[in-house]
Amino acid sequence: MFVINLLLYIVPILLAVAFLTLVERKVLGYMQFRKGPNIVGPYGLLQPIADAVKLFTKEPLRPLTSSVSMFIIAPILALTLALTIWTPLPMPHALIDLNLGLLFILSLSGLSVYSILWSGWASNSKYALIGALRAVAQTISYEVTLAIILLSIMLINGSFTLKNLIITQENMWLIVATWPLAMMWYISTLAETNRAPFDLTEGESELVSGFNVEYAAGPFAMFFLAEYANIMAMNAMTAILFLGSSLNHNLSHLNTLSFMLKTLFLTFMFLWIRASYPRFRYDQLMHLLWKNFLPLTLALCLWFISIPIALSCIPPQI
């Protein structure tokens, strides 16, 4: 029974990720005054399936001087971690309801660094290694702010359980009370998922394709799926943390619908940002975090610690 539940959980995520690639190409197309994919199937709807068939039927090549085991393990690890992150997310019911759901997600997002580092090192290519080192430095740096923001949210919520956030936000979304945190969280998720304008790891003019430059066929598709699964997972997390879930005990199916709509809107914002903003310089990227975000998140964390003490109150879930 658990295997069936797992398949019913993973297959829709993979389908959503596949069609997100089509949505991205369509959105970017219309924003650049062109149509995007429109040949394969009606309105180009079968394009993701054609891409998947093409990638997974090609011969997976690897450089002669590469480290075989790490080269193969890295994309598998990336996709496994990207899909595992979804397990504690309440939609409105999680596959596994964890007491420490927030810590679990933070730990898994930290582990994804290893797949990037291994792929860059195992490829035995200077471009791949530089891209991997950039990605690792960027991901680790922005995880600091993500962790402090999650700590602040946990202090308001009174629990590490994600499901309790739904109850906390029954009357008011947390984005209203904590909008500076929400803003910094959203920008940090852009950097965490290596998306524009923070896609320094894939600077085409200098690094070709970044850490996955030597990958082709199936392993490359795995990295691609992992990246887009992480994007959707991060936006789902944003929806849970700051936009509640409009809990309605009488019409429970509407909870999932509202959650999906919020996640789709946040994902569309990711695509809009990619079409609108140029790439940051690497020193600007690090300056934004260490000089701007980190002091502000620490100050806000202290603020959220001091409020319950000053008002002699406790968070709602304790």
Swiss-Prot record:
Main subcellular location: mitochondrion
Q: What domain of life?
A: Eukaryota
Localization, per the record, is:
Mitochondrion inner membrane
Arranged from A to Z, the UniProt key words for this protein are: Electron transport, Membrane, Mitochondrion, Mitochondrion inner membrane, NAD, Respiratory chain, Translocase, Transmembrane, Transmembrane helix, Transport, Ubiquinone
The answer to keyword Translocase applying to this record is yes
Residues crossing the lipid bilayer are: 2-22, 70-90, 100-120, 136-156, 172-192, 223-243, 253-273, 294-314
Residues annotated as coiled-coil are: none
Catalysed transformations (reactions): a ubiquinone + NADH + 5 H(+)(in) = a ubiquinol + NAD(+) + 4 H(+)(out)
Is Cytoplasm there in the keyword field? no
Identify a single GO molecular function assigned to this protein: NADH dehydrogenase (ubiquinone) activity
What EC number(s) are associated with this protein in UniProt?
7.1.1.2
Q: Which GO terms describe its biological process?
A: mitochondrial electron transport, NADH to ubiquinone; mitochondrial respiratory chain complex I assembly
- Gene Ontology CC annotation, any one: mitochondrial inner membrane
Q: What class of enzyme is it?
A: translocase
Matching PROSITE patterns: COMPLEX1_ND1_1, COMPLEX1_ND1_2
Topological type in the membrane: Multi-pass membrane protein
What does this protein's UniProt record list under function?
Answer: Core subunit of the mitochondrial membrane respiratory chain NADH dehydrogenase (Complex I) which catalyzes electron transfer from NADH through the respiratory chain, using ubiquinone as an electron acceptor. Essential for the catalytic activity and assembly of complex I.
Query: Which family is annotated?
Result: Belongs to the complex I subunit 1 family.
Q: Do you know which PANTHER family this protein is assigned to? A: NADH DEHYDROGENASE SUBUNIT 1 (PTHR11432), NADH-UBIQUINONE OXIDOREDUCTASE CHAIN 1 (PTHR11432:SF3)
On assembly, the entry states: Core subunit of respiratory chain NADH dehydrogenase (Complex I) which is composed of 45 different subunits.
Name of this protein: NADH-ubiquinone oxidoreductase chain 1
Name the gene that codes for it. MT-ND1
